[in-house]
Amino acid sequence: MSLNNIIKNALVSLSDKTDLLKISKILAEKKINLFCTGGTADVLKKNKIPVLEISDYTNFPEIMNGRLKTLHPKIIGGILGRREKDQKIMKLHNLIPIDIVIVNFYPFEKIQNRKEFTIEEIIDNIDIGGPTLVRAAAKNYKDVIVIVDLSDFTSCIQLINTNTVSLETRFDLATKAFKYTALYEEIISKYFLKKNPYRKKHQKNIFPNEFQLNFIKKQDLRYGENQHQKSSFYIEKEILKSGTISSSNQIQGKNLSYNNICDADIALECVKEFSKPTCVIVKHGNPCGVSESNSLIKAYFSAYNADPISAFGGIIAFNCLLDLDTAQEIVKKQFVEVIIAPEIDEMAVKILKRKKNIRLLICGKIEKNKKGLDFKRITNGLLIQEYDCDEINAKNFDFVTNRLPTEKELEDAIFSWKVAKFVKSNAIVYSLNKTTIGIGAGQTSRIDATKLANLKVKDRNHNNTTGATMASDAFFPFRDGIDNAALIGISCIIQPGGSIRDKEVIESANEHNISMIFTKKRHFKH
């Protein structure tokens, strides 16, 4: 191999032809011969750019409606041929050395993300020749420059001008090429795993024997969970739906930190549970104030007042347009790290920009949680589970006490139950009028979580908690949780049930005239 070889021949095969003319003109100006497939060659000929059509060079036509174009020994051999070792065999078979390969693939990903497409369309957009050309060029990186990211083209041309395309550069381009082909194959394989039209429903396996993930960097973060930890934010390569922290757009404020993103994600996912204007305030991975109301400013005011001390420096999420009045109330009341909403009124943005450090995120239209997979990294391993996104249907509840909940109690109980799903276990949530009044989060015993929620209620001087509801993310192992809840006026409790002491727990509720609901489903969160 000699890095001093003059670049003479380039193969250009672009499905996305946005930059085709620009690239081809530059190559032609450098007296570099262009080898192209029929469609690409036609475009160049119309623009009077000299080109050699591959079928003319190979003396073999494109067949099968374009399915077979570039897979020919004269093409693959011209790319794979090592300049020092294979010269003799290349001359024997009249193989022209290809020095540059510039390729992008059929738009499989774009097709599969359309609302409507046929299986024939998706199959036709599986590129065969392109990945073969790219892999061959990357394998022979010492002699062939491979470009799959057109942003690399300008810098490569500058190096070609000075004949200084180093081995390091060639290897980097080859690395990017192999990543490109690997990701392309992964996207296709994922589609086939999920969308097999011939597989019966009962045969579907969401947990294959091997699991691969593909993410791209969205941004570097200020730091990780702690300031001495470096951190970056990666998002799924496949198209993102709106209404997530990953798809959100930051319009002002300092760079996000690792903790900002974690808390904003929890806040946003929690607020999606509610249909009316709702505010969720999160601190250190736990909701500290949640309220649903007929107006957003009332929801914010109530969520903030649920626990104003914890709300200091918190993350706020809304499920609807953030208006001017609410923005003014936020600025007046508290220090906030992040605000995220589907959209923000222009006047509200102006108000919030007075606080330059507030990170302001617009996430776009939100939808209630849908089914998907959740991942948790452990040492040398990965845990995968379905999202906890079960629909709540009161018809499936068991009402197990002598007294049934009133309509209002049932509404508040369901509200509390929705919030409890996002509170770290052991979790206890007290609510009144669709507003949390005390949250006991992350305790190692359920009674401690209950006592903490009681303490939150007392600290806020809630004078009238009669009629408040209590949600527990898991069953009560003993009656002590119910006895403690009764001390502050809890009148309805919602919990999964399933304890060996359920009878004792129900008896306690009856003694205190508390209605109790069994959901028969648990909401642990670790």
From Swiss-Prot:
Q: Which GO terms describe its molecular function?
A: IMP cyclohydrolase activity; phosphoribosylaminoimidazolecarboxamide formyltransferase activity
UniProt entry keywords in alphabetical sequence:
Hydrolase, Multifunctional enzyme, Purine biosynthesis, Transferase
* Catalytic reaction annotation: (6R)-10-formyltetrahydrofolate + 5-amino-1-(5-phospho-beta-D-ribosyl)imidazole-4-carboxamide = 5-formamido-1-(5-phospho-D-ribosyl)imidazole-4-carboxamide + (6S)-5,6,7,8-tetrahydrofolate; IMP + H2O = 5-formamido-1-(5-phospho-D-ribosyl)imidazole-4-carboxamide
Assigned GO CC terms:
cytosol
Where does the MGS-like domain lie? 1-148
Which SMART domains does the record associate with it?
AICARFT_IMPCHas (SM00798), MGS (SM00851)
Could you tell me which InterPro entries the record lists for this protein? AICAR_Tfase_dup_dom_sf (IPR024051), Cytidine_deaminase-like (IPR016193), MGS-like_dom (IPR011607), MGS-like_dom_sf (IPR036914), PurH-like (IPR002695)
- E.C. designation(s): 2.1.2.3, 3.5.4.10
| Any one of the GO BP annotations | 'de novo' IMP biosynthetic process
- What's the short name of a Pfam family annotated to this entry? MGS
Please give the pathway this protein is involved in.
Purine metabolism; IMP biosynthesis via de novo pathway; 5-formamido-1-(5-phospho-D-ribosyl)imidazole-4-carboxamide from 5-amino-1-(5-phospho-D-ribosyl)imidazole-4-carboxamide (10-formyl THF route): step 1/1; Purine metabolism; IMP biosynthesis via de novo pathway; IMP from 5-formamido-1-(5-phospho-D-ribosyl)imidazole-4-carboxamide: step 1/1
Q: Kindly give the PANTHER family that the UniProt entry links to this protein.
A: BIFUNCTIONAL PURINE BIOSYNTHESIS PROTEIN ATIC (PTHR11692:SF0), BIFUNCTIONAL PURINE BIOSYNTHESIS PROTEIN PURH (PTHR11692)
Concerning NCBIfam families, the annotation shows:
PRK00881.1, purH
What family is this protein classified in? Answer: Belongs to the PurH family.
UniProt free text on domains: The IMP cyclohydrolase activity resides in the N-terminal region.
Q: What is this protein called?
A: Bifunctional purine biosynthesis protein PurH
